[in-house]
Design a protein with these regions (language model features):
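Structural preference for solvent-exposed beta-strand-turn elements
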Residues: 3-4, 8-353
């Protein structure tokens, strides 16, 4: 017996970027395949507080953006428990402060985010000339005063690509061009996701990657630094986007299907209505399963996406009937969220992974 799964969750990585970009665009943006969860709803509530009008008709989110120059006088931004939302918003908070004459903006959250050290986000802000203080260094709440003043900014992306994404979303709003140099970039697929979101909302920038042949412990082919050249004075334009299904969730079902199939419990599993050009890092699970000996096949889904992004949706089948899965080797530097499910997969493979 085979099993089919339709991943109802929208990718938080895709949705949070799209929601913030829609807020910065003056006019209506429509985000299809909207499936609310705490982190996505948190982003929606943030932009509502900035003056955006929000409506939902089932699975489509309608956002009437106010535009970057008309952001509300936000004195406090609440990011819930989302590390991504916090890091995306810290550079934007500095821009809001600058628009409001340098008035302080406080970023806070609740729950686990208050125990997370975000020192790299604070260091990046200070490198950009922003005054950022905290009751306890590196921990929320942050008090951010003044805008980004430096036109050449450099910091490490080793600990998080999310801070880089936050700067890439804010720098186009500045009056002058900025050069951002990111050393030791990590989670590069998520940077690609940010860049695609920016393109969809009319933002342009250039980038150049530099390589050192794998020195410093990096895998050959991984850039040692990326230099982004960001023109200033840009405006976000409204857009219609399809929010891709969440590959982080899909990875668990794909592994479960492969393992259960190899044990003869089921024939396999089919993940319905997935996108193979999503740029989500966790899509790599398909290549990993192939390397373990599982069969991964792709067939067109019976639905398509109205032309907001290239590529239609696919049904993806994973089977390993009557075969033991083989040990694998993978570098998860750029897809760290896969670590837990990869440990489960390794436990069901012959040999040492």
């Amino acid at each position: 017996v085979g099993s089919e799964m339709c991943i109802r969750d929208s990718s938080k990585s895709v949705a949070q970027r799209a929601v913030l970009a829609a807020a910065l665009a003056a006019g209506e943006s429509r985000l299809a395949n909207y499936a609310p969860c705490n982190d996505i709803v948190g982003a929606v509530e943030v932009i509502r507080g900035m003056g955006c009008r929000i409506a939902s008709d089932g699975t489509t989110l309608h956002i009437e953006g106010v535009g970057a120059e008309r952001l509300g006088r936000c004195s406090k931004i609440e990011t819930g428990e989302s590390g991504l939302l916090t890091r995306l918003l810290t550079p934007l908070a500095s821009h809001i402060s600058a628009l409001n004459g340098g008035a302080p903006v406080e970023i806070s959250g609740h729950g686990s985010i208050l125990k997370r050290n975000l020192h790299e986000a604070v260091a990046a802000l200070r490198e950009a000339g922003v005054h950022c203080s905290a009751r306890e260094e590196g921990y929320l709440p942050f008090r951010i005063e003044g805008g980004i003043t430096r036109r050449e900014i450099a910091f490490s992306g080793r600990e998080s690509s999310q801070t880089v994404s936050g700067f890439l979303m804010t720098l186009p709003l500045l009056q002058d061009a900025t050069v951002l140099t990111v050393t030791e970039p990590s989670s590069i697929p998520y940077l690609e996701l940010t860049l695609r979101t920016l393109t969809r909302f009319g933002i342009r920038l250039d980038r150049e990657a530099f390589y050192d042949g794998g020195c410093g412990g990096r895998k050959p082919g991984t850039p040692s630094k990326i230099v982004f050249s960001v023109p200033g004075g840009q405006e976000y334009r409204p857009s219609d986007l399809f929010l891709d299904a969440d590959w982080s969730s899909a990875a668990y079902f794909a592994v479960a299907g492969a393992v259960a199939s190899s044990l003869g419990r089921i024939e396999g599993i089919t993940l319905r209505n997935m996108r193979l050009d999503s740029l989500q890092a966790d899509e790599k699970i398909l290549d990993i399963l192939r390397s373990c000996g599982a069969d991964v096949s792709v067939a067109p889904a019976d639905v398509s996406v109205r032309g907001d992004m290239p590529g239609d949706l696919q049904n993806i089948s994973v089977t390993a009937t009557g075969r033991r899965l083989k040990a694998f080797e993978v570098d998860a530097t750029h897809c760290p969220d896969l670590f837990p499910i990869l440990a489960v997969l390794a436990a069901h493979c012959d040999g040492t992974s």
